[in-house]
């Protein structure tokens, strides 16, 4: 689950190192061809159609680009993942969740979760969650592929997370909190009820100290591709 880095702003010399995919070509290069610097940049172009997005995630690839920039596709090595059973529900977090009285719901306000993720990141440093991205993932949500886990406080939406689900893997995209620990509460609920949701692995994409403190760990890209295959 990546943050708000303006990843699409790349030097021209870097863009010349990666292939360009025409919109009519529904395919990707092999992930072994991804660059080391920037880590995981594989190609540019294509589109955000449901068919292309599903193909991308099934191959361990995800889009990540800034608004107004070309679509960039990534498959970093190593990859940050979270095994639901490895989630660290520390005592302080457990007490905070209980004290605040959060309610967790799924797939009730998918677009709103994406918009919250976009607006909170925009306030900080710009966002990669553009209207184009929102529309693309809402289309996936309507197919039952993109999902959201939402945190409510006194009936109000105060945070959560969203991602793409293929098989037993949830490819996490972004998290948001309007009040302390709201996104962590959604993630904790997801991990605690992973069996019911039939989720065995959560892809966190790129390393963050925040997610690693919650139990996420790094695996090689090769291992990741094997796990999602």
How should these model regions be labeled?
Residues 2-229:
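N-acyltransferase acceptor-side catalytic subdomain
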